[in-house]
């Protein structure tokens, strides 16, 4: 069919990819399109493997345009020192914060990362900020990010500066994490129901949640084995 690239034709594929790069460069550098700049950064990273150039485009697109996906990716670069950037958790935090507040495909992931970095304390002179962590975990959990829901349950299970221990909230977020496929959310909720730990004891719910945790663990092991076999 006309217009389709013959993937078996190496020259045709190369020409197609080169044309993509030209198109994205024009969108970004000439037309100043934020989405075009994000596409150019992805092209440089995934096709050209030019991480240094990708980092520079991401930086421009995040700093000047506050493009949510570019800010998320730039934050990830700062976390690992990719693309010639320094490892800089404070810079990463700023990028994730922009992405979280802006909204977009990666905003929920970014909100979770803001929560993690606030909880960890390394972006605040080794002073964990449990209140800020809770607020951003809440945003991510509202977007059905399972790990944020689980981290909220852990905060309420133990209590933290400014956040009193609350077993009902701990159970609520454990069960939500479980419903989103988080094995340890299921395990913690099961334990709370089994022991009656701050909530009404319920052996039936405890058993059901324990079985779900086992199922999730088995599925996780199967996925790991499949990845290993596929290497």
Curated annotation (Swiss-Prot):
One of its GO terms (cellular component) is mitochondrial intermembrane space. InterPro entries: HcpB-like (IPR040239), Sel1-like (IPR006597), TPR-like_helical_dom_sf (IPR011990). Its main location: mitochondrion. Disulfide bonds: none annotated. Pfam families: Sel1. The keyword Iron does not apply. It is found in: Mitochondrion intermembrane space. Keywords: Mitochondrion, Repeat. The keyword Mitochondrion applies. Belongs to the hcp beta-lactamase family. May be required for assembly of mitochondrial respiratory chain complexes. This is Cytochrome c oxidase assembly factor 7. It comes from Xenopus tropicalis (Western clawed frog). The lineage of its organism: Eukaryota, Metazoa, Chordata, Craniata, Vertebrata.
């Amino acid at each position: 069919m006309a217009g389709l690239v013959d993937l078996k034709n190496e020259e045709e594929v190369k020409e197609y990819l080169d044309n993509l790069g030209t198109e994205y460069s024009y969108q970004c550098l000439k037309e100043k399109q934020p989405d075009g700049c994000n596409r150019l950064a992805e092209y440089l990273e995934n096709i050209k493997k030019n991480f240094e150039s990708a980092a520079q485009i991401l930086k421009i697109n995040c700093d000047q345009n506050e493009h949510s996906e570019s800010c998320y990716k730039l934050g990830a670069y700062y976390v690992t020192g990719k693309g010639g950037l320094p490892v800089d958790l404070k810079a990463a935090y700023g990028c994730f914060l922009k992405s979280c507040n802006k909204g977009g495909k990666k905003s929920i992931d970014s909100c979770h990362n803001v929560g993690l970095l606030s909880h960890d304390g390394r972006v605040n002179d080794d002073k964990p900020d449990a209140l800020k962590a809770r607020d951003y975990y809440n945003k991510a959990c509202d977007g059905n990010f399972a790990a944020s829901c689980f981290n909220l349950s852990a905060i309420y299970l133990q209590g933290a500066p400014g956040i009193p221990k609350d077993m009902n909230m701990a159970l609520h977020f454990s069960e939500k994490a479980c419903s989103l496929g988080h094995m340890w959310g299921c395990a913690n909720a099961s334990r709370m129901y089994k022991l009656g730990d701050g909530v009404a004891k319920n052996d039936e719910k405890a058993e059901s949640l324990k079985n779900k945790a086992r199922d999730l663990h088995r599925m996780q092991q199967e996925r790991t084995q499949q990845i290993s076999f596929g290497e």
